[in-house]
Amino acid sequence: DNFIGHKKKLKKELLPALIRWMEANNYPFQFITEASIDLSDDKDLMDMMVRAGLAKVFVGIETPEESCLMECNKKQNNNRDLLDCVKTIQNYGIEVFAGFIVGFDNDPPNIFQRQIDFIQKSGIITAMVGLLNAPRLSKLYRRL
């Protein structure tokens, strides 16, 4: 799920081994993974990912609306410039594709245009926009 969830092991064991294998085999393919937006905070990790052949990363951005990020408890996305974070990852040569959600209680009336503007400004080529749903037994489901 979140590729960077265990950074210590990733940076000391998995990525060095993967880099050696990819170099020895002349980079026969590329990898795609999923990570949280705070990947952009770790320059060394992004460098290692590129050297290991990780070409694309899926990031759950969800929304450019800060109050909605708080609503869905997306702490790693709060209090940061999401556009700048995406650009940082892209500048390392990693293509970002992302997931977005509409339907939060705090979505402003212009949320669709804000999503479009964010996607276009960020250069995200593949954006998956979905409607918020309430899985059974979730807090949202019980509230509704």
Locate the predicted segments by residue.
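Generic recognition of well-ordered alpha-helical segments
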Residues: C85-T88, F118, L140
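Flexible glycine/acidic-rich beta-alpha junction loops that bind and position SAM and/or redox cofactors
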Residues: H6-K9, S67-C72, V102-N110, I125-L144
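Conserved SAM/AdoMet-binding glycine-rich loop
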Residues: D1-F104
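C-terminal accessory region of radical SAM enzymes
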Residues: Y92-E95, S122, Y141-L144
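Short secondary-structure boundary/capping segments
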Residues: L14-L18, R114, R142-L144
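Catalytic cores of alpha/beta
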Residues: D44-M49, D105-K121
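Hydrophobic alpha-helical segments
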Residues: K74-Q76, D117, L144
